[in-house]
Amino acid sequence: MSQPNSQGQSNLAKFAFNIYGTLSTNSSTPQSHEISPSSSLGSSRSNKQTNQYSSQETNNNRLSYYCEKEIMSLSQLNYPLSIGGYNGDLQHHVVIGGKNYLRLLCVSETQQRIISDINLLESKSIYNSRATNKLINVNTIKTYADTIAAGLSNGVVLIYRVSPNGQSKVVGKYSDHSRTINSLDFIDSENQLLSGSQDGTIKLWDLRSSSTKPVMTIQANLHSDPIRACQYSRHSAVRNKICVLSVHDSGALCKFDLRTKNGGKVYSPEKKWNLHTGPVLSLHIHPEKEYVVTGGRDKRISVFNYGDGQSRNTPDSLINTYGPVVKVRWSTYANTKEIVEEFEENQQPNPNPLYNYDIACSYLNDDPTIAIYNLGRKFIPKQIIHSKKPVQNFIWAQNNSKSRKIWTLSKPNSFNSYNLYGLDDSDVSRPIEDLSNVAMTWDNNNDFCAVSQARYDYDLESFGNAINETYEDNYDTERNCSLDNEEFVHSQANSLTASPIEKPQLTRSMTYNPVQSFSTFSPAPVARTATGFLQNEPVTPSSSSSIPNMHLSSSRPKLTRNTSQTTQDSSSSQLSSVIPPPSSSQTYSSPQYKRNQSSRCLNTPAYVIPVSIPVPSNDEYVFQKLSSESLVNIPDGFTLVDVCLINASVAASVNNNRTSQVWKLLAVSIQEEFESGSKLRRILGPETETVSKIPQEVHESLAKTNEALSSDIAKSNSVSSVLGNFVESFKSTSTSGSQFGKQNDKDDRKLQNKNSSGNLMDMINKASRNSSFSTTSFRLKEQERREHELRNTQNFRDENEKVSTHSKSAPISISSHPEDLDDENMSATNSAGLKSSPPSVGVSIPSTRTFSSSLASSPKSIRIMNGVNSNVARSQPSPPVQTWLKQRNFDVSNGVTMMGTSGLSLALKRNKTNEEGCEFVKVWKFKSLLRKSLDYAALQGDIIFCSTVALLFYDIVPDVISQFECLEWLSIYIEILQRKRLFVNAINVIKCATADIQEKLQKLYCSDLSLRFYCSRCQALLVNDKSKFSGKGEFGYWYCDECSRLQSQCVYCNEPCKGLAVTVGLKCGHQGHFGCLKEWFIEDQNTECPGGCDYQVI
C-alpha cells in the first residue's frame, strides 16, 4: 500500500511543477514603476519575495540585498538576459552561493536595484528531473558567458547553463576531487575549466566531453600541498603556451605549462617561487601584464613578474598590511577617470600599467574592512571600505560606465555595492585626506627628519622627467655664481669641527635653534630629484637665509624611496642646499645641478629636512643604565621603601641628582605614612603572614595606644603648624629678629645633638633600617616608643595646666644651652619639624609692635612637644591673629569672661580645621608628592621615571595614576625600548605590569614572530621540499636544496650545527657546537679561534 501512495504523491508533485513551474524562475518581472508587467500569480509572488529581501539606500543609491541563508561565494555573470520587458539590456548580474544557497540576482542597468532573483538549486538537470535537493555548501563560483561553475565543499563541481529568458539547467557534474574546491577558472572559453582543491591537485575538465574524468591532473609535489587559488594566464597565449599559476599552503607560487607529454599528469611545476612565509590565500593576475598579486597570512601583498624573461626570486613590489590577507584583486578598469578636487591637479594616466590599476584586499579573522592600494603610493591605502559586519568575499564589478565599484558579501547574509567614485559615501574613507602634509620622526641617534609633501604629488614620472630638463642660460648663471662663492665655501668648511661627518648649520628663516654654542650643526634641508640625487641650488652667503623661498619659481624635486636617501657620507652633500660644494671636480653640467622653468613644476613634491639637535641630557648610556637597573617591581625580601632607595642610587650613579632626590623623598614619605598609621602601610611589602602571627594582646595594646595618641598628636601638629607661621611672621616684622633667630639656632643645635637624624640622609637611613626589620619586632618597638611618648605627653600637659592656672604672669621659660650658633637666618621651623625631636623645647616669644597690647601684655609659658609624628613639612595654615581679635572683641561685648591667656595660646589650642569645618590636607602627603613628581617628569619628558612609578604604584594608588596615563607611558616606553633594541627590558616592562594593563599591552607588542631563513650562498629561501619528500633524511635550516650546500658547520668538527650553536667571536664570526668549543678552549686550554683566523678569544 505504501508504494502506490508514494508513487502517487511523486506524480502529483511532478504535475504541480509542470503547471506552476519554479516561482523564482517565472518571477522575472521588473518593478511596476519601470515597466508594466503581465499579471500572473507567479510574478506577483516573486515581487513580494524580492521586496522582502532587497533594500535600497536612498542616500548614496547603494545596492543592498539580504539573503535568508548564510553566503560565502560571489561572482558576476556578464550575459544579456531578457526578463520581462527587458530585451537584452540587463548584461551584468550577480551570482551568490552559500550553505544550501545558490541564486542569480538580475541587476538593473544602473546597478542600483535587484530586478529578479533566480534560485539555481531548483533548476532542471540532465541527470534527473530536478537537481538534487541535498544539503550542499557552495565554496567558490566562476562564470563565463552563459555558464556558471560552482565548486562545493564535498569536492563536486556543478555546471549550470543560463538561457536568455533566465531559466537555468544543470549540464555537468564532476566529482573527481576528494576535498573542498577552493578555486575555479575557465580557459579562453566556456568549454574548458580548471579546478583547484584542498587535496593538492589542479584538474582540467573538458565540458564538451561526456566523460566525467579530468583531462589532466596537476600536482605541485608528491605530497598533497593544499591549493588555495589557481588562475589561467591569458597573457601566455601570445607565445602559444597554456600557463596556470597556483598558490599553496606552503607559501609557494607555482607556474605550470599544460603542454605536457606525461600522459595527462604533471607532478612538478615549471617554476616555483617562495614569496611568503606561511600559507598564501589568494592570487590574481594583472589585466594587461604578466604580473601576479598574491596575499597571505604573513600580512603581505606581493607583486611579482612571472614572465619567462625574468630571473628574480623576490617580489617586484611589496605592500605590508595590518592583517592576514584572505582575498586580493586587481581592479577591472584602469584609473583613467579621477575625481578632481579644487586642490588637486588633473593628472594623466601613468605610463606604467602597474600604477593604473588598484589592488583591493580583504582580511582574515572577521575584519570588516576592505583596503584599496595603488603601487604609486603603496605605504598608505588609497581608500578603505568600512562595513558594519565582517567581510566574507568581494569582487570588482563590471559595468557599462566603467566606474570603480566593489561588490561585497558580509557575514552572515548581506550583499552590498560600494561606488568608490562617490564622495558622499560615509562608509568609504580616504586616509590620505586625514594626514598632514608635514610629518616627522626620530631615529635612534636622537636626530629627527621632517618631510613636507603635497597630498597628490607623489611619484609623478612626468615631473621627474621635467626636473632633468636643462637650460643652458641658467647653467652659465649658476656656475658663475658658484665660482664666486668658493672662498665662502672654504671658510665655512674650515669653521666646522673635525668630526668624520661635518654637518652645516640649519639656516632657515622659520627655524629656531636654541643651542648655538654647540659645535655640531644641523644639516641643511635636502631636496631630492626623481633619481635620488641631491638638487644643488647655489646661493650667495648673504641670501642663505632665504632658502625656504628659493623654490617659488621652480618646484622642489620629489622624494624617492631608495636606500641612498638615508645616508650622507660627505659634507659637500649636506651643504648642497646652502652653499656649493668646494671641490672643483664636481661636474656642474650634470642633471642634478640644473633647473627647469616649466609651468608643470609649480607643484611642490616631498621635501626632506634632516635635523640634528644636541641634547646633553639625552644620553644613550644613561638611558640604557636607568632602563636596565631601575627596579620596576618589588623583589622578594625587599619593601617598597627599599626599591625607592635602590632606584635613587641608580639615578645618582649617572649624575641624575634630581631624580635621585625625588626617589629618596618618596621613600621618606612612604615611611612617614607607615609610622602615622595610614592606609599605605600595606605598600611596604607582602608581610601579612608575619602580622597575623602577632599575639592578640599586642594588637589590643597597639589599638589602645593609637587611640590615646590620636588626640594628642592632632594637638601637637596644630601647635607646630601655628607656631611655625607665627614665628615666621614675627621674624619678618620684628626689630629684634636676630635675637630670636639666635635663640632658635640654639634650639636647633640642641635637637641635633640629642638625635642624629636631624637631616634628610639620617631620616632615610633610619627609614631603611626600620624597614629592613621584621614586622613583628618593628611594631613591638613602635609600641614601646609610643607608650613612652604618651607618658611624656601627659606630664607635659599637666605641667602646662599648672603653669597657666597658678602663675598667670609667669615669664616664658627659655631652655638654655651652653653652645651658641651664629647662623641667624636658620628657619624657626627646623627644630619643630624633625622626626625624632626631644619631648619639649622652650621658645622665647618677644613682644612686637605689630600685635595689640593685649596680645603682648600677657605672655605665657608655651612649651611645644615635637614628637615622632611631628614630621617634616607639616605646616597646615592656622587662623590669623585678626580672626582671634574679632572673636575676642565679640566675647567681650557679649560679657563672656575669658581667662587671661595670650592669643597665641588660644590659637595653638584650636582644632586643625578651616573656617568651613573641613580638615586641612597636607600638601606633602605621599599621594600629593607622587602626583607632583609625575607631572614634572611628564613635563620634562622623563619617560623612564613615569613608567617606573606607574609600574610600582599603579595598583597601590589608582586614584593618583589613571589607567589611561599608565597605558600611555608604558606604550611609549616600550616603543622606545624596542627602537633602541632593548628587547629584554621591553618584555620585562610588560611582565611587571598589572593584569589589566598587561592584557592590553600584550595585544599590541607581543605578536607572533615569523623567521625566514635564506641560504647564505645562493640567497634562496630554505624550504627544502626536495629533501623532505625524497626520503633523504631530516633537513632543516642548515641545508639548502637549491645549491646543495650546508649553511652552518662547526669550526671544530666540520659537522652541521643542527641544535645549539656557540659563536666564537663577533669579529671572526666562526661558530661551533658547545661541546666542541668546550673541548677546544677549556680542556685543551687554547686561546685562539679554532678556525685559523688567529683571533684571540681569551
Swiss-Prot record:
GO terms for molecular function: zinc ion binding. A zinc finger (RING-type) spans 1050-1093. Pfam families: WD40, zf-RING_16. One of its GO terms (biological process) is positive regulation of TORC1 signaling. This is Restriction of telomere capping protein 1. Keywords: Metal-binding, Repeat, Vacuole, WD repeat, Zinc, Zinc-finger. SMART domains: WD40. Its main location: other. Belongs to the WD repeat RTC1 family. Residues 779-804 have a biased composition (Basic and acidic residues). It comes from Candida dubliniensis (strain CD36 / ATCC MYA-646 / CBS 7987 / NCPF 3949 / NRRL Y-17841). May be involved in a process influencing telomere capping. One of its GO terms (cellular component) is vacuolar membrane. It is found in: Vacuole. Residues 26-57, 535-597, 731-843 are annotated as: Disordered. Residues 47-57, 535-562, 731-742, 806-816 have a biased composition (Polar residues). The lineage of its organism: Eukaryota, Fungi, Dikarya, Ascomycota, Saccharomycotina. It comes from the Eukaryota. Residues 32-46, 563-593, 768-778 have a biased composition (Low complexity).
